[in-house]
Amino acid sequence: MPCRAAPLRWLGAPAPGGLALPAARPTATQLYAPRGVWLDDEWLVVCDSGNHRILLWRGIPDHDHAAADVVLGQKSFEDEGPAAGGRGPENGLHLPTGVVVHAGRLFVADAWHHRILVWDRVPDVSDTPPDWCLGQASLAAVERNRGRGVSADSLYWPYGLAVIAGRLHVADTGNRRVLIWNGVPDRDAPADIVLGQPDMASADENRGEIGRAHV
């Protein structure tokens, strides 16, 4: 007899299984095209990608359709838009798609700003700006590959990230590669290993051919 698991909680949609688009104005309970999630003993963190923000709940909510406790990337739960609705990239997001909490720090793949944002502690206050980033020279910069050629310290549409065996892995989608740092950096630093390309300066589809080692 098949086993059908039921969700413990539902968040975002107005009803379980609801498919309607959220209201035009975002709230602390609504989600629009979420693409990334993280859960540990302290936080539930969701990339609310379509609203260009990160929502955080303190632990697993105790009821359905619960309001988030913290919002990052927007001035309030009612604001939306890339780069905080035009405020600027220093404290704004453009399509966040991946999230990891490691050693008390929050890492977010800010895909269309071509960077990984880092908070040195998981914020418990809304609209807290990130402390630094990987993939750009500063929090004000948003050009793909830092506005120059592909390199070990540049990113183009980083859609996913993970910490595995103490090493940071980033899916650098636009450059058709995976970058790996030997450890988890505490400042902007070049990657140590590349998968899917022959070297750190290449970004061709399938390395220009098709095979097992290609991305």
Residue ranges and their predicted role:
Residues 52-54, 114-116, 176-178:
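Structural signal for beta-propeller blades
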Residues 42, 103-104, 165-166:
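Short coil/turn segments that connect the beta-strands within blades of beta-propeller domains
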Residues 49-50, 59, 111-112, 121, ...:
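Short loop/turn segments immediately following the C-termini of beta-strands
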Residues 1-9, 52, 112-114:
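Juxtadomain low-complexity/linker regions and immediately adjacent membrane-anchoring helices
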Residues 2-33, 60-95, 122-157, 184-212:
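Gly/Pro-rich loop segments of beta-rich domains
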